[in-house]
UniProtKB/Swiss-Prot annotation:
Cytoplasmic side: 322-332
UniProt domain Ig-like: residue ranges: 185-295
Entry keyword Disulfide bond: yes
Record text on subunit structure and interactions: Heterodimer with B2M (beta-2-microglobulin). Interacts with saposin C.
Positions of transmembrane segments: 301-321
Any single GO CC term annotated in Swiss-Prot or TrEMBL for this entry: endosome membrane
S-S pairs: C120-C184, C149-C163, C224-C279
Name of the protein: T-cell surface glycoprotein CD1b3
Membrane topology: Single-pass type I membrane protein
Main subcellular location of this protein, as a coarse class: membrane
Role, per record: Antigen-presenting protein that binds self and non-self lipid and glycolipid antigens and presents them to T-cell receptors on natural killer T-cells.
UniProt key word Cell division: no
Signal peptide: 1-17
Amino acid sequence: MLLLELVFFAVLFPVGDTQDAFQEPISFHITQITSFVNSSWVKYQLSGWLGDLQIHGMDSDSGTAIFLKPWSKGNFSNEEMSEVVELFRVYIVAFIRETKAHVNALQMEYPFEIQGIAGCELHSGGAIVSFLQGAFGGLDFVSFKNSSCVPAPEGGSRAQTVCKLLAPYHDIFYTVEKLLYETCPQYLLGVLQAGKADLHRQVKPKAWLSSGSTHEPGHLQLVCHVSGFYPKPVWVMWMRGEQELPETQRGDILPNADGTWYLRVTLDVVTEEATGLSCRVKHSSLGGQDIVLYWGHSNPIGWVILAIVSCLIFFLCFALWYFRRLRCEGIF
């Protein structure tokens, strides 16, 4: 039976009956990465995501589910969740076994990697779109559409063979369809409600400027750091007056340990042209009050530190003078 357990990859944690509206589409999806190093060594990663936020994991050694948020189970009971976790354990074992059993038939050579993603996405109008896709070696392989397995062009004859072998198992496709189009939407709406306070929090970004190295003589790299913001969407741009500079280079938005985000935005300029440039930051938590940092302007925090240090030096000098005077007068 060729990779029949693949369909269980669409099993999602069912719960919930309340819809929570989001301005941007948001999805719940499960991702799996299985690396077949050789016939006896296989590694896998299984995780559940709400948008860009990981809320589930699984210990690959023990098969124990990891709930990363207090609300990761949504409204699902412990008993129901235990049943789903057990299903995943069975699925992983069977998926690895069946894949290894058909390595030769599908002309796969070690090492190779299989990826998969399954879930559903809620749009602002209330529509929910479900999906299940598999990849082989980073290329699209198969997907689930209209109650059937659809081979991807990149998958070639190998993907076509997999879909042909799965085609007779109508009960399996019925189960997948039910999970994708009924179970997943129920869970998505439920977990959005359970995690509402956390998901809707607004954390203001902190921003600062620095300089970076550049390989061109006479040039300067301006770096604008933006950190500690939530939610993830943010707009950062180097500006000259009110004009956006298209040469701005935006890095990847990276996660901080506390669940907030960090972004680094750079601009390479001729050193003499850096004066008058600024970095502008827009974020939903700022209430329309953009952060604007001007290159070359002194940092207010720096002035505060300088003032404190100056005061300390003054009082130290005064104390030394005072005690010296007392000593000269014979008091000490």
